[in-house]
Amino acid sequence: MEEDKDSDTLQILNDIINNEPNLEIYVKSKNNNYISSRELPTQDSSTKTSNITTPNNNNNNNNNNNNNNNNNNNNNNNNNNNNNNNNNNNNNNNNNNNNNNNNNNNNTPTSLNSSWKSVVPKRKIDTSSGAILNNNNNVGSPNNQSTSQTNHQQPPPQQLQQQQSLSSTSTPSISPPMLSPSRRNVTSPNLTRSDPTVPITNSRPTSPLTPPLSPQFQLNNLNFDDNNDHSTTTTNNNNNNNNNNSNNNNNNNRPKLMRENSINKRSSLQTLPVSSSSSSSAEDEILIKVWLPMEYTGQLYKVRKFSGGSSTLKVSSMLNSQLSPMYQSPKNKLFLNNEEKPIPSHLTLKDLSLSKYDILYLRREPEYELIIPSSPQCGSLVMDKDIKIDDMLIKIEHWLKDILDHAPHSTSQQQQQQLQQQPILHVDKHEYFTSLEDQQLMSGHITNSSQYTLLKKLSVPTSNSRQTGKMSRGYYLRLYDQKPISNYGIKIKDTLIFKKKILNRGLSIDDAEGGIEITVLYSPLSMLPTTSDLDFEKELKENQQQLNNNNNNNNNNNNNNNNNNNNNNNNITTTTTTTTSSLINQTNEILLPNLIKIDNTSLLQDIKNEKKKRKSKRTPSSVGLPFNIIHKTHVDFEYKWSGTSVEDTFEFKEKLGQGGYGAVFKVLHRETNFPLAIKVLSITPTRIKDIEKEIDLLKKCRCPNVLSYYGSISSKLTELWILMDHCAVGSINDMMKICCDTLDEEQIAVVTLNVLNGLGYLHSKGIVHLDVKAANILLTEDKQIKIADFGVSQQLQTEYGQANVYIGSPLYMAPEVILKAPYNSKADIWSLGITLIELAEGRPPNRGLRSMNQLVEIPNMPPPKLSNPKDWSPCFNNFLATCLVKDPVQRPSVIDLLSHDFIKNAKTTEVLSNLVKQTLSSRQSI
């Protein structure tokens, strides 16, 4: 039987030699003598040889070829079974049986010696396509295939008959021989190239052991790729008896395993089949979180799909083109997680190694850009991110000089001389002040006030009754001249009103009549989304749902892997499986960051415990509760309002006033008709921590003399609404201004008693207010006195606190706070003494100080006192002197002051009835 195999092999070699005149093969005999193929006698089917051996693979340095040779030898029987005809259907169904495989492969040459060599001068044979690669005529290419066929000689009829006899007598397990293109078209018309589009390369093996003109070939079983259709019956059998491994691999989008060629490896320049390339391109897509502030619709980001090989320049150009024409700009660049520097344009998305927590920001460098929709001919105005309002007003005047009725505002010569003579003090650190006058005092000079003002339209709903003329009056926030624009949370699509100043009492609604409407085209604050409106319960649900999805996906993947392992025990080698799985794992880490398996069960248990803790958490007793308002499901344990829209929940009535960072409005709760006060604050990077601290302190306070906190609402990206008690009268300072009168001694005593009660409660909680003054003492319609404004309050973790910057109002600061020395709750006692002088005389002492240099001298000055002490009782004078002790150690506490005779003799709040009625009537008439 072995002699028959050798004769068939020799016959195949003779057929190749007869069709290739330039091909000469040397055969090594048993005597170690090389015999040329031209000297060999013609062999027929009865010729028997047993001296031909297979080549030695040890000289091949290509590791991939060695692995593939081993795979082919191990799976030799299975590969041959896939090419059987209809006559061997039973054998194909039992392709895992080694006995049947050996019986079906009787004609396979297995007794060839390992020293067979061939010499091919300047040629290379590719059996998958039947093309001679190094031919000058590009044999095997689609364009020159017909030309190559004519250049080859047709085989004689005798050889054709021999081939037909061989094909009819041999078993189907014998693989077709390597044929030239001309012979292949005659004998095997069904044999076609596995991939005609594969380019043909002229490269040669680069192994140092391979001579340039005599490349070594390995002679394995002459098998073609599975893509070659040998006959119709073979194709049907292959489809019916296809291995389950290939089906599972296709379902997992893994690259199809390709068998190695019989003589040489497929060229590295050849492409994969179309199905494999399409699957790889699908895996190459990446889902990315993109922040587009110009398209903000309530979500912090959008998910877009891009190719992993796309450069950041291409992605930014694509996103920029999808914006509306007004927001398209060549300045837009990509920033990873809102970093300061943009992403280099040459990097690809795969190079960034994005995770599910990363967000790409499409923005430009920090700056402000303004446009006028009604006057597009004016173009746009670009300003620095740290510009102040007064400088901004001057720029806008010059920008709009063509459409203004008069020339830009210019200062007089006397005012310019005064400005030059007045020194400007440089403040190294950021100082927090609560009023415009305090800011001017600390800046070291009185700046020139412009005749124009700038208003910011707030996102507060207005009713139809407020429509006056062409423009809605709405609700606007005045921007103070000495404040930087970054303090007001100006963002993209905000509306500003540029108009002349109108003198008023500061209590009426600012309207936009006669002003020019300006739209913010770009703002750096739009790049800073906050998570204040994110619900913890919602986040836990999303995390739990994601973990459940991941577990389901992992279970499905494990089931598929088990099926694959059961079906692929005899079909896939260990090397190929390891390589494919490693590639897929690396791809999943980069392209599918959301599908991450979490094996840490303790983490899941912590999340569940935290969720149960949140649900079972009761309202702390230290939180100010709205006792006379009905709360429904739209208020959570953190007092965050959600559910219905703000417009449907509250009805805005009027603007009560404003400060340096926000405004206060009176609203009605529609369901209960209960009045509330909403403080609208602009969220900025420098104010986020202060606002969060203020809310945290409000939630911890439950006292009749402390302003109650009803919750917070995140209406938009850079605005936060704080719900508080509505004090219809307003502050003591507003009441004195409206009534044009100060308080008498009885009224001061009752106010002091209630303030001490509130301060005593705060100090018991470790909270230092640090900004006690008449403007922060509020009165309700029922004559209840409450302490408000915790914007600069501090909760001391130790006995003493340290102030590194000036905190509070400068004229009310305690000496230790001015000197930036350690302080404690007794700093509020000093501020209370200054407030009592303000209530008695209408203004605080040391009002004539004009600079910080003079203010620093307060600790060295004698304690302040009343201007006319004789007009007041000795008890009141003694109480003031007790509060205004410069040494904090000698200064009394709240408990000590409550035992003073001035407080013991205090009456009820009915002594304030006349002032309260006068104030309410004046407010209603406005």
Swiss-Prot record:
It catalyses: L-seryl-[protein] + ATP = O-phospho-L-seryl-[protein] + ADP + H(+); L-threonyl-[protein] + ATP = O-phospho-L-threonyl-[protein] + ADP + H(+). SUPFAM superfamilies: Protein kinase-like (PK-like). May play a role in responding to changes in chemoattractant levels. Disruption phenotype: Mutants have an aberrant response to waves of cAMP stimulation. Belongs to the protein kinase superfamily. STE Ser/Thr protein kinase family. STE20 subfamily. Its cofactor is Mg(2+). The keyword tRNA-binding does not apply. Keywords: ATP-binding, Coiled coil, Kinase, Magnesium, Metal-binding, Nucleotide-binding, Serine/threonine-protein kinase, Transferase. Residues 36-257, 546-576 are annotated as: Disordered. This is Serine/threonine-protein kinase pakE. GO terms for molecular function: ATP binding; metal ion binding; protein serine kinase activity; protein serine/threonine kinase activity. The keyword Signal does not apply. Residues 36-55, 108-117, 183-204 have a biased composition (Polar residues). Residues 650-903 form the Protein kinase domain. It comes from the Eukaryota. The active site is at 771 (proton acceptor). InterPro entries: Kinase-like_dom_sf (IPR011009), Prot_kinase_dom (IPR000719), Protein_kinase_ATP_BS (IPR017441), Ser/Thr_kinase_AS (IPR008271), STE20/SPS1-PAK (IPR050629). One of its GO terms (biological process) is protein phosphorylation. Pfam families: Pkinase. Its EC number is 2.7.11.1. ATP binds at residues 656-664, 679. GO terms for cellular component: cytoplasm. Residues 56-107, 134-173, 215-253 have a biased composition (Low complexity). Residues 534-567 form a coiled coil.
